[in-house]
Structure formats: C-alpha cells, structure tokens
Amino acid sequence: MTSSGANYLRKDALILTHSDQIEGLETLVQSLPQLVFRIAALTEMSPKLLSMLSYKNVVLYQNVSLKQIEQLYLESDIYLDINHGGQVLQAVRKAFENNLLILGFEQTLHDRHYIAREHIFDSSQPDQLASTLEEALSGVEQMRSALQAQGRHANDVPVSLYQETLQSLLGGQHG
C-alpha cells in the first residue's frame, strides 16, 4: 500500500550511498542543471565525492542521521538508485513509500520490485535516464503517469482503494 506521501514535482533527486561509486553521476549532473542532486551518506565522504561540490546543483550530506534522511525523503520527489555497493537502509522501498519517482541503472539496482521497467536503463546510456527524468518533471500529468507505472509494477494498492474494498467486504460498516 502506498503511503499518503505527495509528489510535488520538485526538481530534487535523492541518492543514498555507502561509497563514492555512483554510476553516471557527473553526466547526469551536467545534463540536468535544473535538478538538485542531494547525495547522503551515513559516513564521511571521499575526496572524489566531495569534488562534486564544484557543481551548483549538488548538495552533499556527510555523516547523515536517520532524522536527516527522513527529512531528505520529504524534500525530494525523485530517488536515483545509481550507487554501487549495498543499499542504504532499504532506501528504494522507503523512496517508494514516500511517493518518490525511482529511476536507476540495470547495473546498480538494489530493489527492482519498486522500479518500473521503463525507469531502468543501461549504465552506458545515462542520457536516456536524464531524458525520462526531464519528461516526468515537465508536468503534473507526466509525473502522475510515471508514478502510476511505478505503482503498477509494484502491484501497489492506493490506501483509498484498500479502504473502499475493506468497507465493502465488511458490509459498509465503519470501525
């Protein structure tokens, strides 16, 4: 079931990582200057990742707390599953629960259950991922369509439909 998290078409993308191995990051940052990339790690960041601060659309969060991570989910409308290595704190599922549009590379996916097939790209083609992001961010209907594809892929059931079905099964009684 989806949470009641809203997606506001904000041009904010979240990446949670344990390492500085983030597939296609520089290409994406350069090709999507209007998108803010919020990259968070539970630890210190390497000089390689810190060098990304030379881009105005990159914000880094080192030694991030669980509370800060929760806040980042609320501030972002996109999650990029493009980091190599282990998944941080079930990030993909948490992004799905917060109604973030999730995109990733085939080579870096951590939990494909929550990612629509059309939002998975080969790492040799970051331009396709960027193009799909631009399309989703171009309007409410485009984002809604992308999120619906994501929900269908995950066999998501909106809370309202779940409640209606439950009420009809219980004879319309309220508890």
Task: Label every PLM stretch briefly.
Residues 124-127, 138-173:
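A charged, aromatic-enriched C-terminal amphipathic alpha-helix characteristic of glycosyltransferases
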